Amino acid sequence: MRFPSRLLGANMWVALFAWLAYLVVITLVTVGIGVWGELNESVWEKAVQLTRWYALFVGVALVTEFLPLFIAHGQSRRQFGFQAAVTIAIFAPFLSALLVISFLLESLLYGLTGWTWALGQAHLFSAPTQVPMIFLEYTVMFVGWLVAGVFVSSAFYRWQGGGLLAIVPAVAIVLFVQATIGDKAPLPFISLRIGFDLADSALSAVLAAVGAFVVGLGLTWLIIRDVPLRNKVS
């Protein structure tokens, strides 16, 4: 099987430039709050929420954009499945590394200005200098969201409207993974508390990520292994 250098490289470059732009925006927001308001928590802790939706979008794009391209250029569905799995396995820690840098830069800014840095909810880490735990937490998070995106997208690609049925297990994957890293908050725009009551620990997080990766991509493979190539409607 060929290493997905182009697939992975393209997504990494886009993510890098998107992160640089996002870093500038969040830094300006942080300075604005610190100067004209009251800053007593980490801004990046809140900003992370958008990055996981970005990961979901990348997972969706892996199927909607790259699967037809691979098949049209003579590669098998098995080759695509392998390259997508490798891409997720490397892209998730890459995104996590960008967040590690973000927290370190935020810590430096807070230290220079005398602002108070604190977390608003439970995490695997308690300080911005706990690099290994920050890296682990967000790698686990990105694995869950990337896998959920690939799974849902494959279902919609194959069954179109029938792909709605895949949303429930995809949400379950995300909630399961998030629960092991301390994020037991409800889904956006839902007032009920939905999730799993799991222990917050490095071991639980790793096991959850591995489980989500294997189960989610296994189900994805069952969907795409003989999926027909769809023509895009212009």
Language-model-detected regions and their locations in the chain:
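Selective transmembrane-helix segments that form parts of the transport pathway or gating/packing helices
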Residues: 11-22, 82-104
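Membrane topogenic helices and adjacent juxtamembrane segments
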Residues: 1-36
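Aromatic-anchored segments of alpha-helical transmembrane domains
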Residues: 23-28, 92-96, 170-183
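Secretory targeting signals
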Residues: 28-49, 90-159
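Terminal transmembrane helical anchor/hairpin motif
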Residues: 101-137, 158-234
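Long, hydrophobic alpha-helical segments
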Residues: 44-64
